[in-house]
């Protein structure tokens, strides 16, 4: 079984040229919208050009691309294969990034918009 998991969306209604998606994450207790206006890297490289990563000790992320494309770089030493590169677009579902996972992302040339419906463990 893979270390990489997705929370898929559900189509609940379709009309001419319109699709309604349920993108709920029942576990979520926080949300943020992250907009990259170009091929941004988040977090940016440090002052000498070395890669920087986010890591959350008390938060699981559910990152869903709603516009554009974004590539995530994930490192988790508890996984069988600790290093992954995952490319997301609007059809991918929400990439689940468990707490304790180092992660960073880069948007495609035209940028991207991601909604993160996270679970903060308090």
Q: Each PLM stretch: what is its role?
A:
Residues 1-52:
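A short, N-terminal "cap"/entry segment at the start of jelly-roll beta-barrel domains
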Residues 46-57, 79-82, 99:
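Short acidic (Asp/Glu) patches
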Residues 57-72, 76:
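Short, conserved beta-strand element in jelly-roll/cupin
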Residues 72-73, 103-108, 116:
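Short beta-strand His + acidic residue motifs that chelate non-heme Fe in jelly-roll/DSBH
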Residues 78-96:
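Short acidic-glycine-tyrosine-enriched beta hairpin
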Residues 93-105:
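Histidine-centered metal-chelating micro-motifs
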Residues 120-122:
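Conserved small/polar residues in nucleotide/adenosyl-binding loops
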């Amino acid at each position: 079984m893979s270390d990489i998991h997705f929370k898929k969306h559900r189509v609940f209604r379709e009309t001419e040229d319109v699709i309604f998606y349920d993108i709920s994450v029942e576990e979520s207790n926080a949300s943020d919208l992250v907009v990259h206006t170009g091929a941004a890297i988040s977090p940016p490289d440090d002052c000498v050009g070395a890669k920087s990563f986010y890591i959350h000790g008390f938060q699981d992320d559910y990152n869903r691309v709603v516009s554009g494309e974004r590539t995530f770089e994930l490192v988790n030493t508890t996984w069988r294969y600790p290093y992954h590169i995952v490319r997301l677009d609007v059809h991918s579902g929400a990439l689940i990034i468990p707490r304790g996972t180092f992660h960073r992302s880069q948007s495609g040339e035209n940028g991207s918009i991601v909604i993160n419906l996270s679970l903060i463990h308090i």
